[in-house]
Amino acid sequence: LVGRVRREEIPNAYYKAASIREAIDLPLKKHKVPESERQAIIGNLFAHFDLTSVAREPASALDSEKRHLLAIAAALSFSPAAIVADEPTKGLDEVASARVAKALFSYDKQVVFATHDTDLIVRPEYAIGRVLVVDDHRVVFDGAPREAVDFYTDLVRSKYEAAKGDRA
C-alpha cells in the first residue's frame, strides 16, 4: 500500500466533511476499521502533525500549512509502506515549508516526492540519499542531492539562455 499526497493538498471530499477528524475517519470507517483503532490512528496522526487543536474545524478553515499537514496525515491513515508526494511543500513560505517537510520526513516511512524546491533536498536532517532530475519526461540525472542541485541549476540556466537566444 502506498499513501499519496496530491499537489491539490487534500481531496475535495474533505471539504464536505463537518470536521477534519470526520474527513480522516470516513475512509477508515468505509474500510471497516474498528472504532477504537480508528480513534487511535487519528489521535496519533493528529498529534504527530500538530492537528489536534483544529480537529473539529472544517478543512475550509485551515491555513495552507495545516492543509498540507492534513494531506500527509490522510495519506498515512492506512499505514502505507511508502508515501508518494507531488510538491509536498508547494505554495508555502520557508517556515511552513520546513515544518511540513520535518513532519513528512520524520514519520519513518519511505518518501518518494517531486519538487522544485532545491533547498529542501539538500537539508541534512531529511537524509535524502538519492535524487532523480527529470527533463522532458526523461531521467537526466541520478545521484546525490548536492550534485543534483548543481545539475538542475545548470539545466535551468541553459534552458533560460536558450530561450533568451530564441527571442533575440
What does each model-found stretch correspond to?
Residues 8, 16-30:
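Q-loop/switch helix immediately C-terminal to the Walker
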Residues 37-54:
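Conserved ABC ATPase "signature" region
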Residues 58-62:
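Conserved ABC ATPase signature
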Residues 72, 100:
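Hydrophobic anchor residue at the start of the ABC signature
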Residues 83-87:
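Catalytic Walker B motif of ABC-type/P-loop ATPase nucleotide-binding domains
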Residues 103-117:
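Conserved catalytic loops of ABC-family nucleotide-binding domains
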Residues 138-161:
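Conserved beta-strand-loop-alpha-helix hinge in the C-terminal portion
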